[in-house]
């Protein structure tokens, strides 16, 4: 199935049902009071994470999603039926963003987690709500409020512990093949990797972590050049980044300049991402003699002023990859657990005080001198019509 990690949809919550104006009229009860029921609340729209999904391609073809409207109230104090909530299934790792305000509404990072993205309208009030000692036959009601409407941008961010960075043909896909059972395409030309790849690494029995490989970055990527920039967001949830550096580039370029370009693009795209723990991994060590290799590594470390972790591997021959995987596992285990998120996140809704405000505004209009236009039986007085 085609990998789609971004989609824009429009969600509309259901409107609230209106209240009803009705009076009790039964045999032997000629002067029954008001019995108009309230309307029903409109259905809300939720996103729910589903581990069985891995792409947002469905929402590229289904862009409009509308929840059910609440039913109107009826006589005999019958409350209208509430609208059914609409639940949209999305892959685990999906982030919801308001496309108009750029506000992040929340992330869905665990299976079954729900996120409220559009709240249904509140129900209107029936005339029973407005009866009082001075207004015994009220003909007032309130309408249901409109449901919330949002334009949503859905972004799928892969859930991985380790992210791979590097220029095209640095050996990222070869590395992920050497430490996991993932089989991304490998070839001797740039941009062989066109979409992110995930691999599960098992350095020890019963212990594992997930590694993510994205298309290679080039200079100017933060401004839209190449393919990697649109996939950098997939590294935001990674706990450590591996900067794969080709020690002997096939085009004869300087590894130091390549490393600086990657760091510059990372900082330009997201300072937060650039601040994550980053290990330097020198790849293709089998292409050089040991003495030349050590001289090259010393120069790289000196010119980059690198003070962090550095490892030398040959992903093609699987030299040093197992040891690196073990060190990654130990490092990830030593990190503090990530903060838990609420299972049911909510967003602000502008109608939270609607009912109270509606009651207050209408009741302020009633006083002892109030005279309804239709006041035949306001005071339980029987009106007899004669020809």
UniProtKB/Swiss-Prot annotation:
Disulfide bonds: none annotated. Keywords: Cytoplasm, GTP-binding, Hydrolase, Magnesium, Metal-binding, Nucleotide-binding. It comes from the Bacteria. Residues 1-159 form the Obg domain. It holds the Pfam family GTP1_OBG. CDD domains: Obg (cd01898). GO terms for cellular component: cytoplasm. Mg(2+) binds at residues 173, 193. GO terms for biological process: ribosome biogenesis. Its cofactor is Mg(2+). Residues 160-333 form the OBG-type G domain. It is found in: Cytoplasm. Coiled coil: none annotated. Monomer. Belongs to the TRAFAC class OBG-HflX-like GTPase superfamily. OBG GTPase family. An essential GTPase which binds GTP, GDP and possibly (p)ppGpp with moderate affinity, with high nucleotide exchange rates and a fairly low GTP hydrolysis rate. Plays a role in control of the cell cycle, stress response, ribosome biogenesis and in those bacteria that undergo differentiation, in morphogenesis control. This is GTPase Obg. The lineage of its organism: Bacteria, Pseudomonadati, Pseudomonadota, Gammaproteobacteria, Alteromonadales. The gene is obg.
């Amino acid at each position: 199935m085609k990998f789609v990690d971004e989609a824009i949809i429009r969600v509309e919550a259901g409107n609230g049902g209106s209240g009803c104006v009705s009076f009790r009229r039964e045999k032997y009860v000629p002067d029954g009071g008001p019995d108009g029921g309230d309307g029903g609340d409109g259905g809300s729209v939720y996103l729910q994470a589903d581990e069985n999904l891995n792409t947002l391609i469905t929402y590229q073809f289904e862009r409009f999603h509308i929840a059910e409207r609440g039913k109107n109230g009826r006589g005999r104090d019958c409350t209208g039926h509430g609208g059914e909530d609409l639940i949209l299934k999305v892959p685990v790792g999906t982030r919801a963003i308001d496309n108009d305000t750029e506000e992040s509404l929340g992330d869905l990072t665990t299976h079954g987690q729900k996120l409220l993205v559009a709240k249904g309208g509140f129900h209107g009030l029936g005339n029973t709500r407005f009866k009082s000692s001075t207004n015994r036959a009220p003909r007032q009601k309130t309408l249901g409020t409109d449901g919330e409407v949002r334009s949503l941008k859905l972004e799928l961010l892969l859930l991985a512990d380790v992210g791979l960075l590097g220029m095209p043909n640095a050996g990222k896909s070869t590395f992920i093949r050497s430490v996991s059972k993932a089989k991304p395409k490998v070839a001797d030309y740039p941009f062989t990797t066109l979409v992110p790849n995930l691999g599960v690494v098992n350095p020890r029995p019963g212990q594992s972590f997930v590694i993510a490989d994205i298309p290679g970055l080039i200079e100017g990527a933060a401004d839209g050049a190449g393919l990697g920039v649109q996939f950098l967001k997939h590294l935001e949830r990674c706990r450590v980044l591996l900067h794969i550096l080709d020690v002997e580039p096939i085009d004869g370029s300087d590894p130091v300049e390549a490393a600086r370009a990657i760091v510059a693009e990372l900082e330009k795209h997201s300072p937060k991402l650039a601040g994550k723990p980053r290990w330097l991994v020198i790849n293709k060590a089998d292409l050089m003699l040991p003495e030349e290799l050590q001289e090259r590594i010393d120069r790289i470390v000196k010119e980059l002023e690198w003070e962090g972790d550095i490892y030398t591997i040959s992903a093609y021959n699987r030299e040093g990859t197992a040891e690196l995987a073990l060190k990654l596992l130990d490092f990830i285990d030593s990190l503090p657990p990530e903060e838990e998120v609420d299972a049911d996140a909510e967003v602000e809704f502008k109608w939270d005080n609607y009912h109270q405000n509606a009651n207050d505004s209408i009741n302020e209009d009633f006083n002892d001198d109030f005279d309804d236009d239709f006041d035949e039986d306001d005071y339980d007085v029987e009106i007899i019509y004669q020809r």
